[in-house]
Amino acid sequence: VFLLSGALVAGNYEKAYTLLDALFYQREEPIAILGALATSYVDMVRVRAALENGGTYGDAAQYGDYKGKDFRLKKAQQNVRGVPQQVLRESLHLLLEADMALKGSRLEPRIILDELIAKLLLAARRERA
């Protein structure tokens, strides 16, 4: 899922959908996919905040349980390069909407996640245009 979040913030449609297809092929639970994606985006928000305040990615560890999970913050730092704060905020909002849809909608989970991926990609691309 770390690769998926990286593809999303980079605006890489093909890679994002290939990775999502692979996760569904492996029978990953949609709510688990969404949870892992949300975690990756929260990591990126925390790292972005630390960097904007003159710190390092490691400083973001004080905002969550990262003991033994330093790799998540390193990956978040790689993914967040060049991603505006507004994209991260919008992405968190989209993730929340998808979470509510997965938990309270009769739509197929795959449709909800496909729509989420499209919206996250559009958010990333719009800011780079």
Each predicted region: which residue ranges?
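Helix-rich C-terminal "collar"/helical-bundle subdomain used as an assembly and partner-interaction module
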Residues: 3, 9-129
